[in-house]
């Protein structure tokens, strides 16, 4: 429904025509070209699988894991052979929750303790991330073409690519966070569809709080996925908080758009309780469930700490197993809290979060420049570096600025949602600047950067009231940019995969002094 034009004079009419009812948003609840959308998604996903799985088992460090794979690949192997738990290191400590290592163990179960085995699950998750980004971009832009563009961009992102091909935990965190975001985008559309039908049925004004929205299974799924994110790395908690606030704001805005008398109080009355359940109880339950092998173990780290370092009595009737898990969690937290520069913890490839948006300080995962054949008398260089594709990451600041402007000035919810996801992976790290940090913490920011760029390209393609010449120019601009990103990715491919290159080429690949 739309308001009739009240500014145009009409002969024989002494008063302006007014709308017979309140104006509500048009019934747009998602893309309609399902067949084309899934066909496009299948093609993009197949391309992602080729890039993520090609020569996946290489490189290794003389048959052993590289960089921090040295922590997680062995721990996953222990999980596989110790009934789901890592070896108890005695004086050491296992400092991350179990889900990521449980997933790595699946690949090791299938292919053995080798490069393919410990990287297989991460590559599968990398392909799923590409599919999710493609579907999210298509849904929020209402354009299958924009979805395809986003898919190509995430395929060609160096950070997403390398993280998918190494046995670190971040790729699993990214998959769960992005999947939760995808669920919430579907939930947003479903809420508006329910509000629309409630408006047509006259149920909006039944109370001043507005109608109840019923069971929201997509939001429930988001809660489960966020619990898995927290059970991979604790930084998943940031997404629980940011996404929880985001969905409540979406609910309040929907109630306002459909003329609920008190939309914000209606959100607090109708939506806050269910949201607290989904973003509080469900993730916590999933997190505890991920420790089921730990609870069942007799030898897991700190499993029977009650009665040893902590007393047998408790003020609250909490089971000893949960008290032991709390002690274990606190010990791991203390480890992370003390991993600071002030305490003498330094690493040649550490970085601070203000360098992450533009990939100013990447991480060198592996390098071999001694007696590598293929470059004549001089040794070749084989290296794997986690670095963002410059054609995307170097423009991050203006992209984020534009997204903020669209959110605040134009009230464009799409950019606002993407900013929430990006900032959930970025802002919390400023709370403890002295902590030792690395660029791979920014892996979870990459999909949201890609989504923001894809939305901008979509706005260039579909700018309203364009004449044919401007439409053609916009199409050429978008094609040129996507080709530039793919070319940039192809140029950097050797240092993303460990292919041998000459010393001269290596120096050409290192664009900034801070990359050394």
Curated annotation (Swiss-Prot):
It is found in: Cell membrane. Its EC number is 2.4.1.-. GO terms for cellular component: endomembrane system; plasma membrane. It holds the Pfam family PMT_4TMC. The chain crosses the membrane at residues 113-133, 143-163, 166-186, 234-254, 275-295, 384-404, 413-433, 437-457, 473-493. InterPro entries: GlyclTrfase_39-like (IPR027005), Glyco_trans_39/83 (IPR003342), PMT_4TMC (IPR032421). Belongs to the glycosyltransferase 39 family. It comes from the Bacteria. It is an enzyme of class 2 (transferase). Disruption phenotype: Not essential. There is no significant difference in growth between the wild type and the insertion mutant. Inactivation of the gene has little effect on metabolism or cell wall permeability to drugs. In contrast, tolerance to cell wall stress induced by the SDS detergent is slightly reduced in the mutant. Deletion of the gene leads to the loss of protein O-mannosylation. The mutant phenotype is unaffected by the lack of manno-proteins. Protein O-mannosyltransferase that catalyzes the transfer of a single mannose residue from a polyprenol phospho-mannosyl lipidic donor to the hydroxyl group of selected serine and threonine residues in acceptor proteins. Keywords: Cell membrane, Glycosyltransferase, Membrane, Transferase, Transmembrane, Transmembrane helix. It is a multi-pass membrane protein. Pathway: Protein modification; protein glycosylation. This is Polyprenol-phosphate-mannose--protein mannosyltransferase. One of its GO terms (molecular function) is dolichyl-phosphate-mannose-protein mannosyltransferase activity.
């Amino acid at each position: 429904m739309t308001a009739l034009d009240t500014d145009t004079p009409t002969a024989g009419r002494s008063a302006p025509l007014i709308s017979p009812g309140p104006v509500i948003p048009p019934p747009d609840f998602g893309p309609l070209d399902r067949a084309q959308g899934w066909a496009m998604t299948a093609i993009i996903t197949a391309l992602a699988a080729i890039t993520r799985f090609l020569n996946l088992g290489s490189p290794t460090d003389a048959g052993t894991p590289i960089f921090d794979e040295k922590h997680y690949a062995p721990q996953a192997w222990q999980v596989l052979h110790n009934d789901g738990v890592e070896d108890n290191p005695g004086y050491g400590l296992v400092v991350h929750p179990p889900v990521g290592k449980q997933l790595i163990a699946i690949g090791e179960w299938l292919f053995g303790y080798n490069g393919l085995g410990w990287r297989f699950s991460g590559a599968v998750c990398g392909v799923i991330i590409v599919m999710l980004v493609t579907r999210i971009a298509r849904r929020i832009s209402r354009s299958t073409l924009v979805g395809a563009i986003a898919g190509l961009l995430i395929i060609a992102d160096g950070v997403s690519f390398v993280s998918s091909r190494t046995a670190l935990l971040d790729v699993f965190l990214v998959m769960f966070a992005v999947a939760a975001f995808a669920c919430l985008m579907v939930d947003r559309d479903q809420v508006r569809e329910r509000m629309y039908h409630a408006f047509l049925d006259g149920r909006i004004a039944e109370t001043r709080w507005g109608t109840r929205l019923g069971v929201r299974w997509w939001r429930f799924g988001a809660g489960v996925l966020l619990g898995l994110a927290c059970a991979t790395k604790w930084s998943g908690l940031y997404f629980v908080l940011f996404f929880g606030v985001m969905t409540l704001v979406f609910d309040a805005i929907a109630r306002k758009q459909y003329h609920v008398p008190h939309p914000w109080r209606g959100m607090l009355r109708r939506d806050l309780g269910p949201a607290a359940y989904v973003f509080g109880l469900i993730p916590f339950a999933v997190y505890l469930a991920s420790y089921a092998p730990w609870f069942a173990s007799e030898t897991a780290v700190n499993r029977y700490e009650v009665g040893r370092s902590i007393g047998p009595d408790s003020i609250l009737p909490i089971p000893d197993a949960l008290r032991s898990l709390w002690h274990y969690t606190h010990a791991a937290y203390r480890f992370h809290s003390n991993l600071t520069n002030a305490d003498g913890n330094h690493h040649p490839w550490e970085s601070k979060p203000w360098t992450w948006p533009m990939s100013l300080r990447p991480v060198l995962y592996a390098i071999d420049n001694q007696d590598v054949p293929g470059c004549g008398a001089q040794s070749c260089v084989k290296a794997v570096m986690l670095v963002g594709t410059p054609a995307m990451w170097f423009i991050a600041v203006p992209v984020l600025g534009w997204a903020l402007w669209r959110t605040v000035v134009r009230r464009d919810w799409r950019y606002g949602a993407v900013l929430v996801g990006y900032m959930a992976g970025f802002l919390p790290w400023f709370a403890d600047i002295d902590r030792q940090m690395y660029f791979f913490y920014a892996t979870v920011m990459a999909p949201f950067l890609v989504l923001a760029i894809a939305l901008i390209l979509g706005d260039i393609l579909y700018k309203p009231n364009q004449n044919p010449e401007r439409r053609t120019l916009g199409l050429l601009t978008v094609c040129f940019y996507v080709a530039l990103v793919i070319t940039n990715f192809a140029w950097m491919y050797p240092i993303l995969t460990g292919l041998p290159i000459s010393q001269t080429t290596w120096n050409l690949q290192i664009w900034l002094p801070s990359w050394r």
